[in-house]
Amino acid sequence: MIKKRPEDLRSHKWFGVDDLRSFGHRSRIKQMGYSREDWAGKPVIGIINTWSEINSCHTHFRQRAEEVKRGVWQAGGFPIEMPAISLAEPFQKPSTMMYRNILAMETEELLRSYPCDGVVLMGGCDKTTPALFMGAASMGLPITSQHRAGGQKYSWQPHTGRSHK
C-alpha cells in the first residue's frame, strides 16, 4: 500500500478535521466498535461487493470479501464493505443490460459519498464488471479487481487491461 500523509488522504475530510461534522463521523465509527488506532491516519479502502444468492457468478463473494478485508488490514488500511446491486442474467428480465447503468451510478455515488481512498471492486459477469469500472473510473481513486470477465475462448483482466487466449 502506498504511504501517504494522513492529511493527504481523502478520508481525512471525514475523520481528521477538527470540526463538528468530523466529530460526528469519529463518534459513529467508535459506536461501531472501532478504536481510533483502527482507522486514524490509515487509508480507507472501500470494498464494493455485488454478492447475491441468486447470482451464480457471485455466490462466493461473501467469503472473498472477508479475505479482502483481512488483506486490507494486513496492508495497513481500514476496509469498509459496501453492498451493491447484483446483476444476474439468468433471472433478471428482460435483460441485465437495462440495470448496468444503475450499478455504474450506484458505484460512483458510493465512492463519492463515503470516505474511500481506494476501492476493490467485486463483480464477475459481463455486465457487472464494466458497470463497476464505469462508476469507479469517474472518481479518480486507485481501483483493483481480480476477476476475469469474458467468454470461454477469450477473457479480459480488468486490472491489467490485457486480453488473454
What spans do the regions from the language model cover?
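Anionic-ligand anchoring segments at beta-strand to alpha-helix junctions in alpha/beta enzyme folds, i.e.
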Residues: W14-S22, H60-I102
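Short helix/loop capping segments that flank catalytic or ligand/cofactor-binding pockets
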Residues: H25, E37-W39, N55-H58, P90, ...
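N-terminal glycine-rich anion-binding loops that anchor highly charged ligand groups
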Residues: R36-G46, A75-P83
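N-terminal amphipathic/basic leader segments beginning at the initiator methionine
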Residues: M1-K42
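Active-site cavity-forming subdomains of large catalytic enzyme subunits
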Residues: I29, M97-K165
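Short glycine-rich or small-residue beta-strand-to-loop segments that form or flank ligand, phosphate
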Residues: V44-H58, S86-K93, D117-G124, A131-L132
